[in-house]
Amino acid sequence: MERVVLLLAMISLVKSDQICIGYHANNSTEQVDTIMEKNVTVTHAQDILEKTHNGKLCSLNGVKPLILRDCSVAGWLLGNPMCDEFLTVPEWSYIVEKDNPINGLCYPG
């Protein structure tokens, strides 16, 4: 009996050190677009992007924003060569992306 308990304890330790990443089954109909996929169903979503703008881009605590011009965030992060100029920016307070930037995931734009 002691061996069975010890064996079960060892199995539970082995399984508890694994992290599995995947989609959760839920009844949500909320879908979002990620960098790599479109229409991914999520359990909880909150839109945190600003929809209006007053035309001013301010520094926050003296740190300027990163204005991506014709690059998308995905193109910048995933290595579109047209976005290489932004790789050397040491810091930024927030990121500014145009609505439909020319240089996205595909190269050339």
Curated annotation (Swiss-Prot):
Can you tell me which family this protein belongs to?
A: Belongs to the influenza viruses hemagglutinin family.
Q: According to the lineage, what is the superkingdom?
A: Viruses
Could you tell me where this protein is found in the cell? Virion membrane; Host apical cell membrane
The chain's disulfide connectivity reads 71-83
The protein's PTM annotation reads: In natural infection, inactive HA is matured into HA1 and HA2 outside the cell by one or more trypsin-like, arginine-specific endoprotease secreted by the bronchial epithelial cells. One identified protease that may be involved in this process is secreted in lungs by club cells.
Specify the protein name. Hemagglutinin
Keyword annotations: Clathrin- and caveolin-independent endocytosis of virus by host, Clathrin-mediated endocytosis of virus by host, Disulfide bond, Fusion of virus membrane with host endosomal membrane, Fusion of virus membrane with host membrane, Glycoprotein, Hemagglutinin, Host cell membrane, Host membrane, Host-virus interaction, Lipoprotein, Membrane, Palmitate, Signal, Transmembrane, Viral attachment to host cell, Viral envelope protein, Viral penetration into host cytoplasm, Virion, Virus endocytosis by host, Virus entry into host cell
What organism does the UniProt record list as the source? Influenza A virus (strain A/Shearwater/Australia/1975 H5N3)
Q: Other remarks on record?
A: Major glycoprotein, comprises over 80% of the envelope proteins present in virus particle.
* Membrane topology per record: Single-pass type I membrane protein
A GO cellular component term found in this entry reads: membrane
Q: Which gene encodes it?
A: HA
Residues of this chain annotated as glycosylated in UniProt: 26-27, 39
Statement: the UniProt record of this protein carries the keyword Signal = yes
Q: How does it assemble?
A: Homotrimer of disulfide-linked HA1-HA2.
**Pfam families linked to this entry:** Hemagglutinin
Q: Upper taxonomic classification of the species?
A: Viruses, Riboviria, Orthornavirae, Negarnaviricota, Polyploviricotina
What is one GO biological process annotated to this record?
fusion of virus membrane with host plasma membrane
Q: What does this protein do?
A: Binds to sialic acid-containing receptors on the cell surface, bringing about the attachment of the virus particle to the cell. This attachment induces virion internalization of about two third of the virus particles through clathrin-dependent endocytosis and about one third through a clathrin- and caveolin-independent pathway. Plays a major role in the determination of host range restriction and virulence. Class I viral fusion protein.
What InterPro entries is this protein classified in? Answer: Capsid_hemagglutn, Hemagglutn_HA1_a/b_dom_sf, Hemagglutn_influenz_A, Hemagglutn_influenz_A/B
Which terms does the record give in the GO molecular function aspect?
A: host cell surface receptor binding
Q: Which residues form the signal peptide?
A: 1-16
